[in-house]
Amino acid sequence: MNLDSLSKIIKNKIQNVLYPTSKALLSSDDPSKRAETCYDLSQKIEEFELVCDELYGIIEIHKQNVIFSNINNGTHISKENNPEVLFNSLVSRLSTLRQTKSTMDSFAKEISIVQPIDNKANTNNNNNNNNNNNNNNNNNNNNNNNTNTNTNNTNNTNNTTNTNNTNNNNNNNYNNNNNNNNNNNNNNNNNNNNNNNNSINNSINNNSNNKVGSNDNPSTAPITENNTENNAGNTNNTNNNNNNNNNNNNNNNNNNNNNNNNTNQVAESSNISSNTTPPETTNIVNDPNSVSGGNLTNTEAPMEISDNSEIQHPQQEQQQQQQQQQQQQQQQQQQQQQPQEQIPQQQQPQLPMQQEQIQQLPQQQTPPSQQQPQQTPPLPQQFQQPLVNVNQITSPTLENQSISGNNNNNNDGQTISPQQQQEQLQLQMQQLQQLQMQQQQMNFNPTEPINTNFYNIDLQQPIQQQTLNNNNNNINSLENQINTNLGGNTFNTGTTPPLQQQPQPQQQQQINNPEINQIDDDNTMKETIDVDKIIEESNNVNNNVNNRQVIDLE
């Protein structure tokens, strides 16, 4: 490369790069654009300096060669071709460019515009931001863990409450054992049964959380998709359970101990009077100053078992006792004069229980022409054992025993004959069957169309739930009285086997009216035929509902 070519390169750099950049710098009014132009010009000057440095080295070599050649040849070198002149002019331009570069750098600093950031700096900043985000996520996770810990603490508190309830139940058992030493085994069995019932109730409530329905009547309605509604359902179920427990406590006066009805009732079931009045319930009050081991008994009026099973006010106890005594004496006289007949019950809706828990009682088969629309619905599982045949009871515990009460009854020390005890058992059996049928009437029939208003139960007015609870309490009290009369065995509770009892065949009333059974030639008695057809069609409909299958439309 000769000097001429280098001179052209330098001129092109100056004219095409440096000057336009300088003009753009001077003509721009925007400070940010001026800063960018200054930065661009500074970089171009650096590139020009590299070219000048290369040219400087070439000139040095060329200068020496020219000098030596001139010395050797003795020729004259013109001004334009003199390397020294060219070199000096180049050095002056380089100094000017360096001053311009320094001026551009200082100008960029004066306008206070930050130069563009390198890619390396950007990468580092992004990494720092990512690290900060990770730290934030970790903090959020820690907060979630704290929330879970608080929830666990709440559960522990609930467990502590349950433990306290258990201790209260144990205290009640101790008091009952002091009052009735003969019923220790019954108390233990009943407490175990209460625990089993609690687990069953909890499972039913858990199932009802995912379904639309009340606690006692879970149905197959669509599952709600809103978690908030499910939570509300759980709250409602809890409130209902609390109401149930409160009702049980008010009815049976069990010292506010939930699910302890059987214990107190079995302890009090030995108080049977000659006039067949219900036993008075006792409230066990812990009194350390008492002589009998800290156990005082407060007597209250019994709760009358009425048709609608409503809670009776204590002020009506005298009238109720008188009416109940008169009714029971009349029933005893009627039973002594005539044999007991099965009262035909109307067809009632079945309980919404599982199919494996529903068992039919034995029934007599009658011809289709003699079938009646009255049918006895199945009983719940806890009452599905056959009833006791009173005539077959030969327990030595029922013969001439002097049953004295612990609750200050008026008939303490009276002797009850076996015949009177059998009559009392018959009356109690009748009351138990009536309460069972009444409870089934309150329940929901799953074969009927679903009434959505049925599930809109107001928690502030649990009238139907309270009635069902009263029925349950009355049934439990009757069961305990019957069990005590039978010798202290529990009544189908699941822990002790029930007595081997002979089933009583259900009697059905047959219409022996020849005018109705006989059909004239003119078909004047079509009503009897229509009734039979209706019965058959209803049975077919029920069978179709119970045995419904998926039909392939194709």
From Swiss-Prot:
A GO cellular component annotation in the UniProt record: mediator complex
GO biological process: transcription by RNA polymerase II
Assembly, per entry: Component of the Mediator complex.
Biased composition (Polar residues): 211-225, 265-300
Protein name, per record: Putative mediator of RNA polymerase II transcription subunit 29
Disordered: annotated span: 118-301, 330-381, 398-428, 483-524
Function comment: Component of the Mediator complex, a coactivator involved in the regulated transcription of nearly all RNA polymerase II-dependent genes. Mediator functions as a bridge to convey information from gene-specific regulatory proteins to the basal RNA polymerase II transcription machinery. Mediator is recruited to promoters by direct interactions with regulatory proteins and serves as a scaffold for the assembly of a functional preinitiation complex with RNA polymerase II and the general transcription factors.
Major site of localization recorded for this protein: nucleus
Low complexity composition bias: residue spans: 122-210, 226-264, 330-374, 419-428, 483-517
Biological classification of the source: Eukaryota, Amoebozoa, Evosea, Eumycetozoa, Dictyostelia
Keywords attached to this entry: Activator, Coiled coil, Nucleus, Transcription, Transcription regulation
Annotated S-S bridges: none
Chain's gene name: med29
Family that this chain belongs to: Belongs to the Mediator complex subunit 29 family.
Chain segments annotated as coiled-coil in the UniProt record: 167-194, 419-486
Key word Ubl conjugation present: no
Localization per Swiss-Prot or TrEMBL: Nucleus
